[in-house]
């Protein structure tokens, strides 16, 4: 899977968890855990454009980012 982020960076991974891990590590000061990153990312998304991202699972979080167009899937 390949995606373009809202700021134009192209990322890729085999699973939603891979994608989330790439996004987590791109934060200037990464949170201590992937779950903590999802919580903080959800806060940033809500402040940015009002999007409410779930933090119940990595898959739900990434799917919501795709639905909100925070991530745009690129064809191979």
Regions found by a protein language model. Give the residues of each.
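N-terminal acidic leader/helix
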Residues: 1-29
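Acidic, aromatic-enriched beta-alpha/helix-loop junctions
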Residues: 23-55
């Amino acid at each position: 899977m390949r995606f373009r982020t809202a700021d134009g960076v192209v990322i890729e991974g085999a699973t939603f968890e891979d994608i989330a891990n790439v996004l987590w590590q791109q934060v200037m000061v990464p949170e201590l855990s992937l779950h903590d990153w999802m919580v903080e990312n959800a806060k940033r998304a809500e402040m940015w454009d009002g999007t409410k991202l779930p933090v119940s699972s990595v898959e739900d979080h990434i799917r919501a980012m795709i639905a909100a167009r925070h991530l745009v899937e690129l064809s191979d």
